[in-house]
Amino acid sequence: MTTDAILLTPGPLTTSSRTKQSMLRDWGSWDTDFNAITARLRQGLLRIVHGEGTHECVPLQGSGTFSVEAAIGTLVPPGEKGGHVLVPVNGAYCQRIAKICKVLGRKLTTFEYAEDAQIRPEDIDRLLAKDPSITHVALVHCETSTGILNPLHEIALVVQRHGKGLIVDAMSSFGALEIDARKTPFDAVVAASGKCLEGVPGMGFVLARRAALERCEGNCHSLAMDLYDQWVYMNKTTQWRFTPPTHVVAALDAALTQYFEQGGLAARGGAYAKNCRELISGLAGLGLRSFLPAAIQAPIIVTFHAPASPAYEFKAFYNAVRQRGYILYPGKLTAVETFRVGCMGQLGARGMAGAVEAVRDALQEMGLELANAE
């Protein structure tokens, strides 16, 4: 276990020693051993969603946002070819998808929700019925700015019934919350190496329905982000088109091996759910309220209301918690002051209890009066 501060963030995460050790070797990007790692990763990622035989895994260099942009740019035809994206918005990462569509020149329709409201399948149904020109829906599964969980399966069935394509940003859910391609129809699920799989950042991937991907030649605005070209080239050569992040790929391979050894999705999701319960309960005991009701809270990252005290200031709070070995995340809401605490990654021997204790001691040091303070 690392002696560095533990990252209680939505990614990057604190990784295992085994994952760190995997990055100590250098790899040739065209070497057959490295190509075997890429092939193994692609199969393992498909296995998580039961997509073998129906879907393709296309990895891409860069942060998760690179892969979201690549998915939209590749799967959604340009406006002159009729592409039109509906983006329901209940947080910052939904807004980012809408911005991507605007920058790429894809026709865009948005539908706005409050930051603490789930996206409703009945709204998607009504919007698709109202405007048949919409070709795709782009949905954030777990909105990282709050931790809200949107009803992916129900929305996917609505989108399928209307004959449209669904692109899912699953950055903060993939590997911990169920997405089953056999039951939940989608054209693409997009995720990245540095979240619930507990790799390091630097690589995204798109799990695309093969039949949808096969129709995408010539759609993309970009050479580097063309998932169709990347897919065809990888299948032909077993290699990446451009220099891959070799150490990141090796780390994800090691992390994915550990993921399956530890019990896969059920075990990872269960561990995060336990962390989440202990976090919310522990901070509630200090008088800190979570932003979302439990029914719509994903066990990935939790947003808390900042203490209602003039003595509270986030930077001082952050530094005090950091001195005690934990790194938090600022809030990302527009209406109220908040901070965020992640439930992912390697939390050390004391687990979430150590983080709760660090928050308690930090707030006491700042002179805040706490509920149930010892």
Curated annotation (Swiss-Prot):
Lineage, broadest ranks: Bacteria, Pseudomonadati, Pseudomonadota, Betaproteobacteria, Burkholderiales
Any one GO BP annotation for this protein: organic phosphonate catabolic process
**Could you tell me the superkingdom of the organism this chain comes from?**
Bacteria
- Which residues get modified to N6-(pyridoxal phosphate)lysine? 195
Family named by the database record:
Belongs to the class-V pyridoxal-phosphate-dependent aminotransferase family. PhnW subfamily.
Query: What is the protein named?
Result: 2-aminoethylphosphonate--pyruvate transaminase 1
Reaction(s) the record says it catalyses: (2-aminoethyl)phosphonate + pyruvate = phosphonoacetaldehyde + L-alanine
Enzymatic class: transferase
Q: How does it assemble?
A: Homodimer.
Q: Which gene encodes it?
A: phnW1
Q: Which cofactor does it need?
A: pyridoxal 5'-phosphate
Its EC number(s): 2.6.1.37
Q: Which UniProt keywords apply?
A: Aminotransferase, Pyridoxal phosphate, Pyruvate, Transferase
Checking Gene3D superfamilies in the record gives: Aspartate Aminotransferase, domain 1, Type I PLP-dependent aspartate aminotransferase-like (Major domain)
What is this protein for, i.e. what is its function?
Involved in phosphonate degradation.
- Which GO molecular function annotations are given, in alphabetical order? 2-aminoethylphosphonate-pyruvate transaminase activity
The UniProt entry, under Pfam families, shows: Aminotran_5 (PF00266)
PANTHER family for the chain: 2-AMINOETHYLPHOSPHONATE--PYRUVATE TRANSAMINASE
Which organism was this protein described from?
Polaromonas sp. (strain JS666 / ATCC BAA-500)
Q: Which SUPFAM superfamilies match?
A: PLP-dependent transferases (SSF53383)
The record ties this protein, via InterPro entries, to: Aminotrans_V_dom (IPR000192), NH2EtPonate_pyrv_transaminase (IPR012703), PyrdxlP-dep_Trfase (IPR015424), PyrdxlP-dep_Trfase_major (IPR015421), PyrdxlP-dep_Trfase_small (IPR015422), SP_NH2Trfase/AEP_transaminase (IPR024169)
